[in-house]
Amino acid sequence: MAAAAAAAAEQQSSNGPVKKSMREKAVERRNVNKEHNSNFKAGYIPIDEDRLHKTGLRGRKGNLAICVIVLLFLLAVINLIITLVIWAVIRIGPNGCDSMEFHESGLLRFKQVSDMGVIHPLYKSTVGGRRNENLVITGNNQPIVFQQGTTKLSVEKNKTSITSDIGMQFFDPRTQNILFSTDYETHEFHLPSGVKSLNVQKASTERITSNATSDLNIKVDGRAIVRGNEGVFIMGKTIEFHMGGNMELKAENSIILNGTVMVSTTRLPSSSSADQLGGGDWVRYKLCMCADGTLFKVQVTGQNVGCQVSDNPCGNTH
């Protein structure tokens, strides 16, 4: 059969192509397909896909990876916004920073008006202005506070207050002369030149004096208490007490009034003659004075009551 096929092939090649029938072509095509399929499946081994090792991020790992990527994206956006804000505030340009300068000596110089909330200078640092120019510090409807430890200087619209637990001292930076100090053991307390009054809630000192050509005025809105551990001595050419309420003098031993004592009766309350003596809850007294200046009171129990009572402290003189 093979010899016949070879002879037919030789005859076909020598005599030209031989036409095949439809059946022969179909059989030939089927044989070619079988041979092709057998060659394709020669090295194929079927394997269960579920038993293969899976690669990549799947399940929870995939979700976690997505969250990390989103978080990194948000951080990048925030970093970009902060960078743009810093760029706009500091004004960094081709010529450098337009708002400030950094020097090798450690000096930081601001070249324009700067808006800051809190400034923390370094150890032994100085905040100042340029030569022949003022350093202007303003607060937007808020006080300006300089604080170091417990010492605080507050500058407000209507007042300036200084708070310190260890004292304070003012001196001239050029001459180094002390203008004002609360170190009473070393320096005597003097008001600075131009200061007319000192407003304090409580003062503890050995002596309060005024200049020889000026008066010493002590004024309070409410109640004033002057207390001394070993007595209170008030000396002056003229001593006047003006008060809207009562004046109370207390002493363990005695109260001595030296000099001329004058009491203005026009300021003392008086009762009309039509008032009944001892009526109601009122108790009336008459103010009396001895020849040596001792004051005492006598209860008014009726009309024409004088100071001649048996238990007066004046003795035989009234």
From Swiss-Prot:
The keyword Transferase does not apply. Residues 87-318 are extracellular. Disulfide bonds join C288-C314, C290-C307. It is a single-pass type II membrane protein. GO terms for biological process: muscle organ development. Residues 1-65 are cytoplasmic. The chain crosses the membrane at residues 66-86. It holds the Pfam family Sarcoglycan_1. It comes from the Eukaryota. Residues 1-32 are annotated as: Disordered. Glycans are attached at N158, N211, N258. Keywords: Cell membrane, Cytoplasm, Cytoskeleton, Disulfide bond, Glycoprotein, Membrane, Signal-anchor, Transmembrane, Transmembrane helix. It is found in: Cell membrane, Sarcolemma; Cytoplasm, Cytoskeleton. GO terms for cellular component: cytoplasm; cytoskeleton; sarcoglycan complex; sarcolemma. The keyword Cell membrane applies. Component of the sarcoglycan complex, a subcomplex of the dystrophin-glycoprotein complex which forms a link between the F-actin cytoskeleton and the extracellular matrix. Cross-link to form 2 major subcomplexes: one consisting of SGCB, SGCD and SGCG and the other consisting of SGCB and SGCD. The association between SGCB and SGCG is particularly strong while SGCA is loosely associated with the other sarcoglycans. Belongs to the sarcoglycan beta/delta/gamma/zeta family. PANTHER family: BETA-SARCOGLYCAN, SARCOGLYCANS. This is Beta-sarcoglycan. It comes from Oryctolagus cuniculus. The lineage of its organism: Eukaryota, Metazoa, Chordata, Craniata, Vertebrata. The gene is SGCB.
